[in-house]
């Protein structure tokens, strides 16, 4: 199905790049994408850049396969990917990290109401305990991707606004500001070292 959608889209407009899926399990694409929501910047870097390869990890069948790594499925796992022989990223097309972050932050009242109830409010990992911890985590995760700018040509923080129970936006559901937007702007305006 995805190969047909890709081909049809290219027939309609061959000048535009086509991404057949966001974040992994790519069948045919012009832009390779990955998702990652690890909240610890050091662990995030190891996930994104594992043994000199973008977003590969040991197969859960690592031992029985003689030490094979999975193909670049992004955040999707083998159980989701099934048995289809998906292509592996070869470094020849743009790699965009199109979802990362997802840091939960909400007002104190909502935080208390949502304790241990993801149906009310959730984000990825543990919520920061302070605004300063939020800024530090956001900058650390973003710096990981910027440090790999020789390999990753773009990134997208998830997400811009809270959506229903997802409390991981940079703005509240009503689009009011959660944070000091000058600090947020400073993080997202950083230029990779090798671009200076």
Q: What is the predicted function of each stretch?
A:
Residues 16, 25, 38-39, 162, ...:
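Residue-level detector of flexible, active-site-proximal loop/helix-junction positions
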Residues 21-58, 93-103:
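Aromatic- and acid-rich polysaccharide-binding/catalytic face
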Residues 52-196:
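Substrate-binding clefts and catalytic carboxylate motifs of secreted carbohydrate-active enzymes
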């Amino acid at each position: 199905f995805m190969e047909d959608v890709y081909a049809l889209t290219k027939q309609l407009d061959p000048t535009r790049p086509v991404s057949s899926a966001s974040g992994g399990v790519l069948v045919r694409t012009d832009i390779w994408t990955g998702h990652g929501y690890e909240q610890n910047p050091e662990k995030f870097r190891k996930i994104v850049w594992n043994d000199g390869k973008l977003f590969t990890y040991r197969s859960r069948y690592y031992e029985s396969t003689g030490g094979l790594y999975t193909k670049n499925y992004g955040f999707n796992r083998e159980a989701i990917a099934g048995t289809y022989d998906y292509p592996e990223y070869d470094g020849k097309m743009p790699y965009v990290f199109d979802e990362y972050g997802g840091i939960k932050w909400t007002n104190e009242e909502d935080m208390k109401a949502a304790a241990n109830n993801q149906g009310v409010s959730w984000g990825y990992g543990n919520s920061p305990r302070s605004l300063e911890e939020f800024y530090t985590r956001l900058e650390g995760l973003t710096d990981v991707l910027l440090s790999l700018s020789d390999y990753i040509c773009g990134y997208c923080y998830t997400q811009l606004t809270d959506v229903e129970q997802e409390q991981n936006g940079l703005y509240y559901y009503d689009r009011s500001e959660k944070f000091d937007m000058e600090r947020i702007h400073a993080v997202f305006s950083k230029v990779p070292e090798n671009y200076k």
